């Protein structure tokens, strides 16, 4: 049984979820920098860790997590109820392709729990979480465009190899990428992930010439310790910092 993952303001119980909390997810949540979002949707919420991190970082926001895996949703609900943010965090069992929000959404965060072109896992719950053959980056971006209000904010965590693909998908659906944060484990390893921040444009005010700012994030130094950059980023969440 997986142990609970304790943070400074909340604890994530994860014994029933398809995929446990990872350091990459924590880094992504800590990197999230919504400017104006007050209604945030966490797509593929899993344990609820990103939803809870968003509630901690943005005290005026309401956060809803959505996931297709019922045991994960049930456990995320418990995590939300037991957190200081119970009045602002909720979790829904639904397919994001069918979901229709009750209130307009102006912020979406998503750590897509799938890897295109990877073989399915032999374990069914991990297969469900990590391999959705009919759910591509293009369909995800299209769905986010439909759900978000104009000028809404989108945050995605993706494999670094997906950069060209996601930039093309964002352009197709009238998003302007603002920043791309490359995430590498150590200074000598190439980035394995990117965190993409984009804004949904009005159809009448869309330009493909918007400059994209690139930021580099390195988690560990050569001696295996957290970098000062990582320590500063995660000190509001990790107990040991």
Where are these regions (language model features)?
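Conserved Class I SAM-dependent methyltransferase catalytic core
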Residues: 17, 21, 135-187, 191
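Conserved SAM/SAH cofactor-binding pocket of Class I
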Residues: 30-102, 107-110, 116-121
């Amino acid at each position: 049984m997986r142990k609970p993952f304790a943070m400074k303001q909340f604890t994530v119980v994860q014994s029933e979820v398809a995929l446990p909390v990872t350091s990459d997810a924590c880094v992504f949540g800590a990197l999230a920098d919504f400017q104006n979002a007050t209604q945030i949707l966490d797509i593929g919420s899993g344990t609820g860790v990103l939803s809870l991190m968003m509630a901690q970082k943005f005290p005026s926001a309401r956060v809803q997590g959505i996931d297709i895996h019922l045991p994960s949703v049930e456990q995320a609900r418990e995590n939300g109820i037991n957190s200081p943010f119970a009045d602002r965090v909720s979790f829904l069992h639904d397919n994001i392709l069918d979901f229709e929000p009750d209130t307009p959404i102006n912020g979406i965060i998503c750590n897509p729990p799938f890897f295109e072109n990877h073989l399915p896992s032999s374990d069914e719950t991990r297969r469900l979480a990590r391999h959705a053959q009919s759910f591509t980056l293009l369909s995800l971006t299209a769905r986010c465009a439909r759900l978000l209000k104009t000028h809404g904010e989108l945050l995605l965590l993706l494999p670094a190899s997906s950069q060209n693909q996601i930039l093309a998908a964002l352009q197709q659906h009238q998003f302007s990428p603002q920043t791309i944060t490359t995430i590498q484990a150590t200074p000598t390893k190439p980035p394995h992930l990117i965190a993409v921040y984009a804004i949904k444009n009005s159809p009448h005010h869309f330009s493909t010439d918007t400059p994209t700012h690139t930021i580099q994030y390195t988690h560990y130094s050569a001696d295996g310790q957290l970098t000062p950059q990582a320590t500063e980023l995660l000190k509001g969440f990790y107990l040991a910092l």
